[in-house]
A protein has these predicted regions:
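Conserved beta-strand signature within the Rossmann-like core of class I S-adenosyl-L-methionine
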Residues: 200-207
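A short glycine-rich, Lys/Arg-flanked "PGG" loop and its adjoining helix->strand segment in the class I
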Residues: 187-199
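Core SAM-dependent methyltransferase catalytic element
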Residues: 228, 241-263
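Conserved alpha-helix/loop element of class I SAM-dependent methyltransferases that forms part
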Residues: 78-96
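Conserved SAM-binding loop of SAM-dependent methyltransferases across substrates and taxa
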Residues: 106-118
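A short acidic, Gly/Pro-enriched loop at the edge of an enzyme's catalytic core
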Residues: 160-172
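Class I SAM-dependent methyltransferase Rossmann-like catalytic core
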Residues: 12-16, 62-83
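Conserved class I S-adenosyl-L-methionine
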Residues: 95-105, 123
Length: 263
């Protein structure tokens, strides 16, 4: 059985854009070009409206197809896999230790960390909202079974308020989650995540950490150091480590940064 981690670009969105492009082109030809049953100013107006709609839909369809192919686990680029594996490399569990993946989606990062740390266990949590309907708890469990991973489990949880006591886990990780939580203070989310990390535990949090979303992250790094964290580092993953600057720009992933270290 092969795991199905799903694409970060939902098929439904891509097919909707393709359908919208085809429909707007058909309407442009019928009313704007051939002027079937319309004429004069109305023909011109409809031609402009459907022409603009076609150009916009075609542009977004082109981007969507490119992004889908880039992220696909079955494609040549496999960018999602590179990001997941690259993030998992920074998670280390002690013998019998437990790590937490926040916003686990289809379970890819949870499972990757579990495979790298057979001496411990990984827990993946997510609220599995309607906006990401292709991700689910049963899907995560199926993927773990497909990978032959027995040291990973999944449950519902909310990144805004983690239902765990302080210093509960030996490692915490997350990938492209917090930027999706609108209205939340991103640095506060990071502190909430690190609250449940044990002293000496490792962390690797990957997200779009642009100043507009996260504020001054260099100051945040210094804050953690002042709090006694053993090691804290910000890594720009658009420098070729995960993706090239060109890919980051085309895929709207500029600002991709990995916050790693040890508490």
């Amino acid at each position: 059985m092969k795991p199905d981690y799903k694409n970060w670009i939902p098929k439904g969105m891509m097919f909707s854009l393709i359908a919208g492009t085809a429909l707007s082109l058909a309407l442009l030809l019928v009313f704007g070009v051939f002027g079937i049953e319309v004429g004069g100013k109305l023909r011109v107006v409809l031609g402009v409206v459907f022409g603009v709609a076609f150009v916009v839909c075609a542009k977004y369809t082109q981007w969507c197809v490119y992004a889908y192919r880039s992220f696909s686990y079955d494609g040549e680029r496999k960018l999602s896999k590179q990001i997941i594996d690259g993030t998992a490399e920074h998670i280390t569990l002690p013998e019998g230790g437990v790590g937490l993946d926040i916003g686990c989606g289809s379970g890819a990062l949870t499972i990757a960390c579990a495979k790298r740390n057979p001496q411990g266990k990984m827990v993946g949590i997510d609220r599995w909202g309607k906006e990401y309907a292709s991700f689910s708890l049963p899907l995560c469990e199926k993927n773990a079974a497909a990978e032959g991973v027995e040291n990973a489990s999944f449950r519902r949880g909310n990144a805004l308020k983690l239902d765990f006591p302080d210093e509960s886990f030996d490692a915490v990780t997350s990938n492209y989650v917090y930027h999706n939580i609108t209205g939340a203070d991103k640095q506060a989310l990071l502190l909430e995540t690190l609250r449940i990390l044990k002293k000496g535990g490792t962390f690797a949090i990957h997200d779009l950490m642009s100043p507009g979303r996260y504020g001054d992250m260099q100051a945040f790094v210094q804050k953690l150091r002042d709090m006694g964290y053993e090691r804290v580092e910000l890594m720009d993953t658009t420098d070729g480590s995960f993706m090239t600057p060109k890919e980051a720009k085309r895929l709207m992933l500029r600002g991709s940064t990995l916050l790693v270290g040890r508490k």
